[in-house]
Amino acid sequence: MSKITLVLTMNYITSKIAKEILNSQSEEIFLNLDLNKTEKKEKILIDREKKIAKFPEGDVSFDILKKIAKDEGHIYFIKDGEVFKAAISNNGYYKLVPTIPPTIEINGIRMHRTKEVNPYEDTLNKINAVKVKKGEKVLDTCMGLGYTAIEAYRRGAEVITIEKNPNVLELAKINPYSEELFKGGIKIILGDAYDVIKRFKDEEFDVVIHDPPRFSLAGHLYSEEFYKEIFRVLKPGGRLFHYVGNPGKKYRGKDLQKGVMERLRKVGFVNVKRVEEALGVVAVKPRD
């Protein structure tokens, strides 16, 4: 269990930003450089003689900006005067996708819904499904970029979040929308939720939010054994939200939500219901 502090001093460049700079006819341009997390605009000086754009965090050549302009699928950032791609190639390919707010993509699979809703709206649907309240203790089993943990914390909950993949944790450190994760108020545990959950005491949490990778990637997090552990760590009356995915889609001919609901009931959960807008299931640990 750790508290990680982080200070983000980066300028972010997307294809759109690069195009605006290259197409500008002025010697300076004011643009948002924090992926629209705020409305703040920064001054960028354009030196056509030297073919560079002077950002607050460093100079970027026109050649690099032209490459970024053609790459609509990635986010780039300037740190300590150098330009980096917000992507990691290590046991797979991990990248931040320039949605607002960003989502994370692992080997071509996006970890948030980005079509019907944006990642922030997706998060609100999950949090609202279990009505997180001030003073409650919340376990977020699969951190990702931490939007769920952050929203629960903003509502006054004590939050512990688990992330298995160090690459995901590194991308969260780059993402400005994840900054609140690293300010010390949210506890982060690096490990597999299947194992980490066994460390917690009986009846420790008011709420568990379980948003695992898809079944084909993390079947053990959909198992009856794992659901028993969730049931154990929840207080009587405690609530679970379990993201499952689109109920209209089936994995190898099986209705995943139906199977999840059956296993949750089998381990003792009651009031097990589908939550269509959040593409998941809610359940309650009985008080008796």
From Swiss-Prot:
Superkingdom of origin: Archaea
Protein known as: Uncharacterized protein MJ1233
Disulfide bonds: none
Taxonomic lineage from the root: Archaea, Methanobacteriati, Methanobacteriota, Methanomada group, Methanococci
One GO molecular-function entry: S-adenosylmethionine-dependent methyltransferase activity
Record-linked InterPro entries: Erg6_SMT_methyltransf, Methyltransf_11, SAM-dependent_MTases_sf
